[in-house]
Amino acid sequence: MDMIASAKEHGLKVAIGSSSPHSWVDTHTQRLGIYHHFDHIICQDDVAPGRTKPHPDIYLKALETLQVDKTEAVVFEDSPNGVLASKRAGVFVVAVPNPLTARMNVQGDLTIPSLAALTLQDLMNR
């Protein structure tokens, strides 16, 4: 949450792009008390059927909704399909493998072991 809080403090827009349905994502972000931190949540219900990750549609929809150019966006992803979707959308991707995907070859434009390994300032300086 430090990265999200820092992004919001700098006036940056923050969204979730998920291949899961809104019913799942909205429920869990509300349960965790983080729903209000996001400007938008884009899910499988927001794109054409069969166009979730690794297709770029979720990220393209997020860029359109946020009114952000792909050259000014960053995606944080934990899965190979998500990294591929981000790259296909032309967005810089930071891969942060989770315990399940750590054994897979999840390689973003930048790959880090955890969000704690990178500050927003470090990212903005790249």
Predicted regions and their residues:
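Short, acidic loop-to-helix structural element flanking the phosphoryl-transfer center
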Residues: M1-I16, H22-D26
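Asp-based, Mg2+/Mn2+-dependent phosphohydrolase catalytic module
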Residues: A5, H22, T27-R126
